[in-house]
Regions:
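RNA-contacting regions in translation and RNA-metabolism proteins
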Residues: 1-43, 47, 52-75
Length: 75
């Protein structure tokens, strides 16, 4: 799942080297924290959060297939 988020974010970002995904396991869920360069935040989040929401949906689907829960946070 971490690789999926990294792949999508690096494809969108102007500076793919600045993309960092951190995975934190809490209780019964996994929290993925996505960090990108300041100038790429708008691109990665998208208009009215559409890209961010699409990434969250894909992450949720992958988590359900794996039998877990996952959350995506933008830092």
């Amino acid at each position: 799942m971490k690789e999926l988020i990294e792949y999508i974010a690096k494809s969108i970002a102007s500076d793919p080297n600045s993309v960092v995904v951190t995975e934190v396991v809490e209780d019964e869920r996994t929290v993925f924290r996505l960090e990108v360069a300041e100038e790429d935040k708008g691109k990665v989040i998208g208009r009215q959060g559409r890209v961010a929401e699409a990434m969250r949906v894909l992450l949720r689907v992958a988590a359900v297939k794996a039998g877990t829960r996952a959350v995506l946070e933008f830092v």
